[in-house]
Swiss-Prot record:
Protein's recorded name: Uncharacterized protein YcgB
InterPro entries, alphabetized: Spore_V_R, SpoVR-like_C, SpoVR_N
Organism: Escherichia coli (strain K12)
Recorded family membership: To B.subtilis SpoVR.
GO biological process: DNA damage response
Taxonomic lineage: Bacteria, Pseudomonadati, Pseudomonadota, Gammaproteobacteria, Enterobacterales
PANTHER family to which the protein is assigned, alphabetical: STAGE V SPORULATION PROTEIN R
Pfam families per UniProt: SpoVR (PF04293), SpoVR_C (PF24755)
Length: 510
């Protein structure tokens, strides 16, 4: 079992402020770094930037990125955040951390030294180590090139605005953003290339793509037999879930610069793909380590009681889970659930009960530090909950499941936190973090190559859930990119196909 001695008291205590200086930040950072190394936290080098509340709101509005291309939606988000913040209806995060190499962490200058220490432990060592080591981030993102790529994207889109007009570029980005969640291949992992390679390939990609589009949309087949075979074959041969990629490669009317912008939005969507699937784990891991590191410093006598009281007050607020019948309830707090599960894994390893040995025979009594790193590296929220959610955590959170069947006019409590309900609760909760259950399953089904060039999308409902009424507006964006008629079908449980929408609509069809 891993044992790390944190009880050697040090009579030299760090200043507890509350005001901070850059020198004091350096001292705290050095101590946090020393403790983090004891727990084998493997991180990227970090770059810490202290910013104002207005700069933090600006970072909020640009989805936390240090630089981004221009679009009205970012300004709208800034104004909304600023209004809520100034009226006291919304607070600001103490930090924002960027999955990059070096890992960029933004600290609010209004923070006390206690909060700055918490943020450095949370972001620079918790999130940072998660970004570097979790399998989804390793497979789907390239931390060393994201900032350079965003600089390239900003420059390219700005040049397009100057050449083709702001309105034209804005309309294209509107459509790309509307389909951003459908810009990732979930099973085909992206190839990692440097910014220099990206630029070198850009010109050749433009020429190649246009030649491929010309080949796809040629109207005069060489031989009659070729025509017959082509008409009998559906295109694409398999349904395609990556709508933006398909548009980039196949939309008949897009120009090369428009295809490049689609590619840029796809790349940004791909960057955020792991984050959507690891919020509980990522925040839980970072919260576990800021709690562990700062308690370690207190046990060593490095920080004061006043420091700890302020820290624990903030930490308790972060991991508070309102009950289901509270007016402040808005779902399960990912900080609370993630922190509780990592704490529980440590407990199961160090002091397993008979219940723990039955539920977790592989990890009960094992090295807690090794087990925690294994859980962090090789799981995402769905599988993490399915594998490690224990009966104790279910009891602590008082979990129960509510079955809402659209075929009945009542709700059913199908499981509670007891022996009969543990497995169902765990399965139901993990399925809530399955991205396939959270986003509509809409795929490109067919293109009428030899007819009117119409595009057919097919929606396969999950648990008979209907599409939102906003589907009409989204279909307009698909039509803008494709350039020809677009149809949206639904495949029902009995296998029948139903036409939901057509853009542009035809009189008498809908």
């Amino acid at each position: 079992m891993a044992t790390i001695d944190s009880m050697n008291k040090d009579t030299t205590r760090l200043s507890d402020g509350p005001d901070w200086t850059f020198d004091l930040l350096d001292v705290y950072l050095a101590e946090i770094d020393r403790v983090a190394k004891l727990y084998r936290l493997d991180t990227y080098p970090h770059q810490i930037e202290v910013i104002t509340s207005e700069q933090m709101m600006d970072a909020y509005s640009s989805v936390g990125m240090p630089i981004n291309y221009p679009h009205w939606s970012f300004g709208k988000k800034f104004i909304e955040t600023e209004r809520l913040y100034k009226h006291g209806q919304q607070g600001l995060a103490y930090e924002i951390v960027i999955n990059s190499n070096p890992c960029i962490a933004y600290l609010m200058e209004e923070n006390t030294i206690t909060m700055q220490a918490l943020v450095m432990a949370h972001a620079c060592y918790g999130h940072n180590s998660f970004f570097k080591n979790n399998y989804l981030f390793r497979s789907w993102t390239d931390a060393s090139s994201i900032v350079d790529y965003l600089i390239f994207a900003r420059k390219y889109i700005t040049e397009c605005e100057e050449r083709y007009g702001v309105d034209e570029v804005e309309r294209l980005l509107d459509s790309c953003h509307a389909l951003m969640n459908y810009g990732v291949d979930r099973y085909k992992r992206p190839q990692k290339i440097s910014l220099q390679e990206e630029k070198a390939r850009q010109k050749s990609r433009e020429e190649y793509l246009q030649s491929q589009v010309n080949m796809l949309w040629r109207t005069l087949p060489k031989r009659e037999e070729e025509k017959t075979v082509a008409e009998a074959r559906r295109y694409p041969s398999e349904p395609q879930e990556n709508l933006l990629y398909f548009m980039e490669k196949n939309a008949p009317l897009l120009e090369s610069w428009q295809r490049e912008i689609l590619r840029i939005v796809r790349k940004v969507s791909q960057y955020f793909y792991p984050q959507k699937q690891t919020q509980v784990m990522n925040e839980g891991w970072a919260t576990f380590w800021h709690y562990t590191i700062l308690n370690h410093l207190y046990d060593e006598g490095k920080v004061t009681e006043r420091f700890m009281l302020e820290f624990l007050h903030s930490h308790t607020n972060v991991v508070f889970q309102p009950p289901y019948n509270s007016p402040w309830y808005s779902g399960i707090n990912p900080y609370a659930l993630g922190f509780a599960m990592f704490q529980d894994i440590k407990r199961i390893c160090q002091s397993p009960t008979e219940e723990d040995k039955y539920w977790f025979p592989d990890i009960a009594g094992s090295d807690w530090l090794e087990t925690l790193h294994f859980a962090m590296r090789d799981f995402k929220d769905e599988s993490f909950i399915s594998q490690f959610l224990s009966p104790k955590v279910m009891r602590d959170f008082r979990f129960f499941t509510v079955l809402d069947d659209d075929r009945h006019n009542y709700l059913e409590i199908s499981a509670i936190h007891n022996e009969e309900g543990y497995r169902e609760i765990r399965n139901r909760l993990s399925s809530q973090y399955n991205l396939s259950n959270l986003e509509p399953n809409i795929q490109i089904w067919n293109v009428d190559l030899r007819g009117d060039r119409s595009l057919t999308l097919r929606y396969i409902p999950h648990n008979r859930a209907p599409l939102d009424r906003g589907r009409k507006e989204v279909l307009k964006h698909v039509h803008r990119l494709w350039g020809f008629d677009v149809m949206l079908e639904q495949q029902n449980e009995d296998g029948s196909i139903e036409l939901l929408e057509r853009c542009p609509p035809r009189m008498g069809n809908l």
